[in-house]
Amino acid sequence: MKSNNPFTRHGIEHLSPSKINLWVTDPALFIGTYLCGMKGSYGVGAFRGTAVEFALNKKIVDTDLSKEATNEFLYGSFNEQCIEKGLSTENIKAQKERNTLETYYDQAFNVYKDFGVPEFYQHKIYYTLHEDLPTPFLGFIDFVFNDAIRDLKTTARMPSSISTNHQRQLAVYSKAFPDKELWVDYVTPKQAVSYKVENVEQILNQVIKISLGLQKFLSISDDPYELASMHYP
């Protein structure tokens, strides 16, 4: 029996902040990736962020962890991700990122060292955001503390303000812990800056409107290539 859900008819079993943000910033790439099966590229910068978060969690949970042990988690996580993607750790880009890991980690630790032990790390959320959106949202929260949700972003250049994409991401997470503050922590090798997400309900309503708009677009046709023809890359 044919589904009445436009998302599942196109093979989209769940929504996520990254999918919604991609739909807004680059509809053609969204269509190519999620409707037409085009394989997306990946950057080793993402490996860097995951490795820093992993080692950071190990350290703030066990404050007695030595620098050597922490580095084992840091470099081990990075190398493992490279291997999983079939990327040699001798790759020039991988080496460049690997050489900066400790500087990113040190900046992140200076931010997180006084927050205590997190209640959750990489906490999975999975829920329906709106009654008119049958497809649930899936996401993973970096750190959940007693009073706040915190998302760590490693970046080569410090932004002047919190990005709209990251505000949407944290707003989606807020549904799981509505009483907690939302913070995005940007970390470069030289500094760290934290931004609190304000106007959460307004941003969440924006996410809902974007999602409903995407749902309406997908309902136009079950043929992904017909939908693709409506957007010039």
Where are the predicted features?
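Metal-dependent nuclease catalytic cores that hydrolyze phosphodiester bonds in DNA/RNA
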Residues: 1-140, 188
